[in-house]
């Protein structure tokens, strides 16, 4: 047993030398030099280092969306988000995502720029949406790993995404960003945080030849606090980008969806988040409320919140400023 622990410690030390700024390891991550901009489906976005919010409506009037994002107490911004409302083969498709990077912003920005672009091109987007999503996660991860060959610092990202196709809502997730819906007034988690101490995740990692050990929290190889992610090429054998996908029917009982990075969920429960959003019809204001509450409760991480409100059961749409629209 002593030999196993010693070997594990040596492996951890070796990995730490390759993960100098992994935010899943330390809150005091070194600031990434090339954070870039957070952009929203081609709109003028907010600079990655400053708080921003915005939103809009679908052309068919069936849903509204709003987002709010801030670096919080961190000096660097590794959260990204994306919202798109695209017409594909005559169908309106809504795509929403929150991407929380670690080891810098590089991986999260790549996923934000490529995941939905790849998905709307998938030939099975309508005929087999779940397969299309799963295959797109995998192929986008492969593209990221190829792009990462020129970097000597490892980087990765979570992804919590929601796809609206007709009366179907499909939520896919890797990592510890989270999706929660309000249905019939109840808070329901529609994603699972991927942590290495979960029995099935730990078994999968160990079956692949890896190990999970305690280093402040349970970590893959003693380094990474999430068990699934995009990127993380040095741990890719164990840290997969295979999403868990859940489908919900969009009907009159489905009120809204919240997607958020762990900067929210570390300090706000699912039930609290739903209770905060429920009385606020304006999706942007709802997202801002969540962000403000997380900040007031002392969240130590970047905070990104995205709210999608389903409007078929509403009698009217709340007014929104015209400057949220594309210029």
Curated annotation (Swiss-Prot):
Binds 2 magnesium or manganese ions per subunit. One of its GO terms (biological process) is regulation of intracellular signal transduction. Its EC number is 3.1.3.16. InterPro entries: PP2C (IPR015655), PP2C_BS (IPR000222), PPM-type-like_dom_sf (IPR036457), PPM-type_phosphatase-like_dom (IPR001932). It catalyses: O-phospho-L-seryl-[protein] + H2O = L-seryl-[protein] + phosphate; O-phospho-L-threonyl-[protein] + H2O = L-threonyl-[protein] + phosphate. GO terms for molecular function: metal ion binding; protein serine/threonine phosphatase activity. It is an enzyme of class 3 (hydrolase). Residues 1-24 form the signal peptide. Its cofactor is Mg(2+); Mn(2+). The keyword Cell inner membrane does not apply. Mn(2+) 2 binds at residues 100, 262, 301. The keyword Plastid does not apply. Keywords: Hydrolase, Magnesium, Manganese, Metal-binding, Protein phosphatase, Signal. Mn(2+) 1 binds at residues 100-101. PROSITE patterns: PPM_1, PPM_2. Residues 64-310 form the PPM-type phosphatase domain. Belongs to the PP2C family. This is Probable protein phosphatase 2C 59.
């Amino acid at each position: 047993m002593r030999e196993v622990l010693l070997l594990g410690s040596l492996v951890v030390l070796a990995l730490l030398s390759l993960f100098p700024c992994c935010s899943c390891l330390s809150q005091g991550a070194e600031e990434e030099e090339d954070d870039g901009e957070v952009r929203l489906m081609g709109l003028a976005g907010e600079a990655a280092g400053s708080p921003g919010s915005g939103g809009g409506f679908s052309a068919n009037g069936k849903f509204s969306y709003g987002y709010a994002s801030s670096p919080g107490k961190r000096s660097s911004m590794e959260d990204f988000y994306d919202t798109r409302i695209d017409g594909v083969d005559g169908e309106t498709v809504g795509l929403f995502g929150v991407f929380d990077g670690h080891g810098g912003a590089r991986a999260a920005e790549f996923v934000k720029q490529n995941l939905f672009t790849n998905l709307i091109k998938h030939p099975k987007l309508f005929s087999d949406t779940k397969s299309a999503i799963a295959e797109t996660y995998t192929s986008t991860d492969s593209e990221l790993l190829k792009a990462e060959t020129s970097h000597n610092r490892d980087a990765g990202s979570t992804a919590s995404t929601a796809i609206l196709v007709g009366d179907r809502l499909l939520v896919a997730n890797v990592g510890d960003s989270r999706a929660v819906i309000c249905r019939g007034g109840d808070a329901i988690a529609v994603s699972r945080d991927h942590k290495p101490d979960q029995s099935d995740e730990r078994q999968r990692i160990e079956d692949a030849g890896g190990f999970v050990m305690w280093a402040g929290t349970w970590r893959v190889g003693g380094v990474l606090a999430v068990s699934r992610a995009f990127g993380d090429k040095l741990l890719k054998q164990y840290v997969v980008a295979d999403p868990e996908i859940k489908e919900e029917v969009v009907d009159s009982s489905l009120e809204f969806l919240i997607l958020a990075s762990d900067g929210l969920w570390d300090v706000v429960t699912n039930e609290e988040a739903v209770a905060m959003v429920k009385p606020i019809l304006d999706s942007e204001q709802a997202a801002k409320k969540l962000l403000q509450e997380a900040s007031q409760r002392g969240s130590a991480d970047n905070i990104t919140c995205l709210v999608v409100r389903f409007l078929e059961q509403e009698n009217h749409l709340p007014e929104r400023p015209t400057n949220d629209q594309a210029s």
